[in-house]
Design a protein with these regions (language model features):
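Basic, Lys/Arg-enriched alpha-helical interface segments
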Residues: 1-63, 72-76, 83-117
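Short, surface-exposed charged micro-motifs
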Residues: 67
């Protein structure tokens, strides 16, 4: 299987680059597994964000999360990366990832329409 490219939506790459080095390296490793069609080491489905969205859970003394969707053939889309500061994921983080997924779905739909004309 070919490795899927990563597509960073919104400010997700900048968000991940702001992680401490250990968390950033772990996130990179986990995303490389996903690119190869494998599951990350510690993950959880996030149906409240949208269909097919998965949360990578990174534990390095502080908690970091990366939301992605890999259900599309062409790429792994990274929706959001953030430091988790409370037990429950903040509504703002869930809404941001959800809005980026909505935009992704809209752009993919528009592209398919353009390909048919």
């Amino acid at each position: 299987m070919d490795e899927k490219p990563l597509v960073w939506l919104g400010s997700s790459l900048r968000e991940l680059r702001a992680f401490p080095e250990v968390a950033r390296r772990r996130a990179g490793f986990e995303l490389s597994l996903v690119q190869q069609g494998l599951l990350p080491s510690d993950w959880k489905p996030m149906p409240d964000v949208g269909a097919g969205v998965v949360e990578i859970r990174i534990h390095t003394g502080t908690e970091h999360r990366v939301f992605y969707v890999a259900r599309f053939e062409e790429a792994v889309y990274v929706l959001h990366a953030f430091e988790k500061k409370t037990q429950k994921t903040a509504r703002l983080d869930l809404e941001l990832a959800s809005s980026r997924l909505t935009e992704l779905n809209r752009n993919r739909k528009d592209k398919r329409k353009g390909d048919r004309t």
